[in-house]
Amino acid sequence: MMNRLLVFLMLGAFMLVVSANDAYGDEPAFKDLNQGDESLGKRKSCCPCWLRGNCFWGQNCYPEGCSGPKV
């Protein structure tokens, strides 16, 4: 029973991190979309640098979420 509870809690924590990462990256993209910025496609494939450069799926690391210069 404890193993199932532990797995459930770990999955919940993982989903929370994934959703927080999505929310962090969406705001600049919507702002750029409203301003007609054509770099929207580039900014969809990025991650914040507080992940210490451990970006997934070949994403680029940006210090300010998706809006800063690439690191």
Swiss-Prot record:
Organism superkingdom: Eukaryota
Alphabetical UniProt keywords: Disulfide bond, Ion channel impairing toxin, Nematocyst, Neurotoxin, Secreted, Signal, Toxin, Voltage-gated sodium channel impairing toxin
Signal peptide bounds: 1-20
Propeptide cleavage-removed residue intervals: 21-41
Disulfide bonds: 46-61, 47-55, 49-66
GO-annotated molecular function: sodium channel inhibitor activity; toxin activity
Keyword Secreted in annotation: yes
Coarse class of the protein's main subcellular location: secreted
Localization terms from the record: Secreted; Nematocyst
GO cellular component term of the entry, any: nematocyst
Entry similarity comment: Belongs to the sea anemone short toxin (type III) family.
Function per UniProt: Voltage-gated sodium channel (Nav) inhibitor. 1 uM completely inhibits insect voltage-gated sodium channel inactivation (DmNav1 from D.melanogaster).
Descriptive protein name: Delta-actitoxin-Avd2b 4
Organism, scientific name: Anemonia viridis (Snakelocks anemone)
